Structure formats: C-alpha cells, structure tokens
A protein has these predicted regions:
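Alpha-helical transmembrane segments and their immediate juxtamembrane cytosolic regions
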Residues: 1-230
Length: 230
C-alpha cells in the first residue's frame, strides 16, 4: 500500500510543481489503480481477473450510457474514473505472474500464447468498441494487456532462456520505477537547457536528451550498487 500511496503523491506533487495544475498523470494513475486493485490481490487469481473484467465492463458501460466521454477525455490517462479500466491490467499481470512464479518451472510459452490470444481479443473487440487511449476503452486495455504479455514473454525467452544480457536494459530494470519518476525531472532540465529556437528538431532533442539522462542515471545507480525501492 505504501508504494501506491507514494506513487500517487509523487505524481500529484510533481504535476502541481511542474505544470501548476491538478492534472491526472501516469503516476497518479499507477497509485490510484494499485490502491483500487489491492483487495483483488487477496482472492484467488481467477477470481481477481473476473472481478477486474467486471470492473472494466462497468467502466465501459458507464462511459457509453452516462455521457462521460468528455469528462474522461479531459484528463491524461482517463482520470480517476479510468481506474476501473486500468485495474484489469494490474490484476491480470499480478495474477498470471503470481501463478507461474509458484511453479518450479515457468512456462514462457503459456505467456506468449496467452498474450497473442488476448491481443487478438482486444483487436477484435475494437470493431465493437474502438481502440481509444484517451478514453481508456475496454478494447484498448485488453489489446495493450495482450501486447505487454507478449513482450514480457519474448523478453523472458531472450534473457532467461537465451542467456542474453544487455547492460543498459539491465541497469534500467534495476531501478525502473525511480528512473521513471526522475525522468520528469530530467525532462524539465532538458527543456530549460535547450534553446527554444529549434522548432523542428526540438521534440527529437528533448526525447534523446531525456533518454540519455535516464540511461546515465541508471548506469550510475547500477555501478554504485544503489537500488531504490518504494
């Protein structure tokens, strides 16, 4: 619970300081979703997924029937109401990984097949409910969950089965959450440092400098053995 509260507070305070607004960013979404889905972690995995699917369905019905599209679209990440939708991603990932971790041997093929099937289900459902990131539609959530599961499986094959090690990714993974939080700070410094008279390449420069700054922080943390947990 502490981690989710801290994520929400980091996001809330950071947005207030950086943008002087009460917008709903990624960190607020992560914190609120974690707190909302916390009770689901105390029930069997299958029940947890079913409950999160029910939550996702309720959100989509409310979105379509109660005229909430404009309200939700006004926030980044869908705002507080979209917590009902994001809950499925967290519940599914925690439940599926939790079940496999308890086994002596993890079967990555199940994750890969499951990811492809879920992504396909999300794609097919988009013909009924269009994929919409701003509204955090159910098709978007299901499709994204499938893609994330597939990517996780491929990474597992590459690292755990194939034995590949990529130093930069390893460093980023060891402090992924704190690096993500600090990325907004790095981005702010980059925007101040770069000249404003480069309209064409400005977004590219910001992206490259921010990415480079985050990688540099991750490498420094890894070399000094610093691992920050929330």
């Amino acid at each position: 619970m502490r981690r989710y509260v801290l994520l929400f507070l980091f996001g809330f305070v950071g947005t207030l300081i950086a943008e002087r607004s009460f917008d709903w960013g990624i960190l607020q979404m992560l914190g609120a979703t974690g707190l909302f889905a916390l009770p689901f972690m105390f029930v069997p995995p299958s029940y947890s997924v079913i409950l999160s699917l029910l939550s996702l369905a309720i959100y989509q019905i409310a979105l379509d029937c109660l005229g909430l599209r404009a309200f939700v679209a006004g926030f980044d990440m869908g705002g507080p109401l979209a917590t009902l939708s994001w809950c499925f991603v967290l519940s599914f990932s925690a439940s599926s990984v939790g079940v496999e971790v308890k086994k002596e041997h993890v079967n990555p093929w199940k994750f890969l097949l499951g990811g492809v099937v879920i992504a396909l289900a999300g794609f097919l459902s988009s013909f009924l409910v269009p994929l919409n990131k701003h509204l955090v539609s159910c098709s978007y959530i299901i499709f994204s969950t499938g893609l994330a599961t597939t990517l996780f499986s491929l990474t597992y094959f590459l690292v755990e089965v194939g034995g590949s090690r990529i130093g930069v990714l390893d460093a980023l993974g060891k402090n992924s959450l704190i690096i993500f939080i600090l990325s907004s700070v790095v981005s702010t410094f980059v925007e101040v440092a770069l000249p404003a008279s480069t309209p064409v390449v400005y977004p590219v420069l910001i992206t490259l400098c921010t990415l480079g700054g985050c990688i540099a922080l991750a490498v420094v943390f890894a070399r000094r053995g610093i691992y920050i947990k929330l």
